[in-house]
């Protein structure tokens, strides 16, 4: 829930506190992916859970496609919790009734040069994994993934 006063919010906090406590016993972390909630809501949830093994898998396209944040600005809010990054491109929703669209990397609205620069500024040195969910046929998918990888390598 985006409202921390929602009756379900305390249940989510309790469940995550339990899960992360159990994972910590085994030296494991729990990562939540960005997307359906604004970055400040995810940060508040992490802070309310209060365990030091709860982090974020940052997906810039999800933040755009759900209309929740500019991905570069979102790093100002969540940067210290980012432990994994999806390289995925997308656009903001065009109506209030549907999600934005996914695009091949470098063809959508994610400002990848600015995004990579901001990742470096916050000291992020973890993985950047290409995520590609567009069904375009095997050969076209392969080509767009290869082109996206080359584009990312040119700005890393």
Name these PLM-found stretches.
Residues 1, 88, 131:
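Conserved residues at the C-terminal ends of beta-strands
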Residues 1-55:
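Active-site acidic/histidine proton-transfer and metal-coordination neighborhood
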Residues 10-17, 21, 40-47, 72-79, ...:
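Amphipathic, non-transmembrane alpha-helical secondary structure
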Residues 18-30, 115-125, 155-156:
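A structural motif corresponding to the C-terminal end of an alpha-helix
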Residues 30-32, 54-58, 83-85, 126-130:
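Hydrophobic faces of well-ordered beta-strands that scaffold small-molecule active sites
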Residues 34-35, 61, 132-133:
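Short strand-turn motif at the edge of the Rossmann-like AdoMet-binding core
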Residues 62-125, 134-143:
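Gly/Pro-rich active-site loop or hairpin
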Residues 139-156:
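C-terminal helical cap(s) of enzyme catalytic domains, especially alpha/beta-barrels
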